[in-house]
Amino acid sequence: MSNTDKERAIAAALAQIEKSYGKGSVMKLGQRPNIDIEAVSTGSLGLDMALGIGGVPKGRIIEIFGPESSGKTTLTLHLIAEAQKKGGTCAFIDAEHALDPAYAKKLGVNIDELIISQPDTGEQALEITDTLIRSGGIDMVIIDSVAALVPKSEIEGEMGDAQMASQARLMSQALRKLTASISRTNCIAVFINQIRMKIGVMFGSPETTTGGNALKFYASVRIDIRRIGSIKDKEEVIGSQTKVKVVKNKVSPPFKTADFDIMYGSGISKEGEIIDLGVKLDIVEKSGSWFSYNNVRIGQGRENVKQYLKEHPQIANEIEKIIREKSSKITNMNLDQMEEEND
């Protein structure tokens, strides 16, 4: 088979796959992201770029997972705040019964307009989710978390009763129902999930997420969020360094990464990301511990520069605008980073 015939055969196969399974189900890894898909910002400049379309896609299922206290709920609260800024209506299904309204408000969430439900069982939670999505008036629904979606049979049973795969069956059935409604209403469904360890794994990662495999298949975007370090002010811990990896992405090439700071009480540090991405793209100059922008020194030490940008929002916005214009370059840098890590 000649090269031309091969290219035609591949193009025909790709067209057939897209026709059968939808646009974005297959693409070349280095292909330009599909910019026609509507997106909602995550509140993180770096993560928006790693996702390839400027945020999470509308009309899709998103899974955010990671260890305890890694920033999963913080990230989803930022998502709600960004959706509300665009005039969207959001719902929070609090299966864990752990949402802190005061913290949500600090992150920019309009709690007066946020619809909240604290269901008793997994079936109730997913029925409420289904009803809200089918209404067509909800732009984003958060389910916190999959691990807390306990089936009714387990709640009504005795302690110690074996409920083999009942949660996995519940999730599989619910996602089959939800997928079409989510796509039709252009709603974003975000599932927060926890990590568990598989027993007896000799090779590969022993980590897995709760609720069976259905969510892994139905999710268009899966985001792995991890705490990689602490941010200290002298001896006091004031935040955590966070790394996110887009482990699945059906709307843009996957495996991109982003780093950001989560400051206790205020959420994702936009200023920290502007500094880091600005230095990567040579927009902000770094010489030793000094940082400069347009040949003017803006501070010594990263924390001091963050404070400077907070006090001078016009400079922060100016640098952010330039970073977004050069976002394609950042995408390539992330791919190069991944290649280096794999080598």
Swiss-Prot record:
UniProt signal peptide: none
GO cellular component: cytosol
Superkingdom of the source species: Bacteria
UniProt-recorded Gene Ontology molecular function terms: ATP binding; ATP hydrolysis activity; ATP-dependent DNA damage sensor activity; damaged DNA binding; single-stranded DNA binding
Matching PROSITE patterns: RECA_1, RECA_2, RECA_3
Binding annotation for ATP: 66-73
Gene3D superfamilies in the record: P-loop containing nucleotide triphosphate hydrolases
Matches recorded under NCBIfam families: tigrfam_recA
Protein's name in the database: Protein RecA
Compartments reported by the entry: Cytoplasm
Principal subcellular localisation of the protein: cytoplasm
The family this protein is said to belong to: Belongs to the RecA family.
Upper lineage: Bacteria, Pseudomonadati, Pseudomonadota, Alphaproteobacteria, Rickettsiales
Alphabetized InterPro entries for the sequence: AAA+_ATPase (IPR003593), DNA_recomb/repair_RecA (IPR013765), DNA_recomb/repair_RecA_CS (IPR020584), P-loop_NTPase (IPR027417), RecA-like_C (IPR049261), RecA-like_N (IPR049428), RecA_ATP-bd (IPR020588), RecA_C_sf (IPR023400)
Role according to the record: Can catalyze the hydrolysis of ATP in the presence of single-stranded DNA, the ATP-dependent uptake of single-stranded DNA by duplex DNA, and the ATP-dependent hybridization of homologous single-stranded DNAs. It interacts with LexA causing its activation and leading to its autocatalytic cleavage.
GO biological process: DNA recombination; DNA repair; SOS response
Keywords on record: ATP-binding, Cytoplasm, DNA damage, DNA recombination, DNA repair, DNA-binding, Nucleotide-binding, SOS response
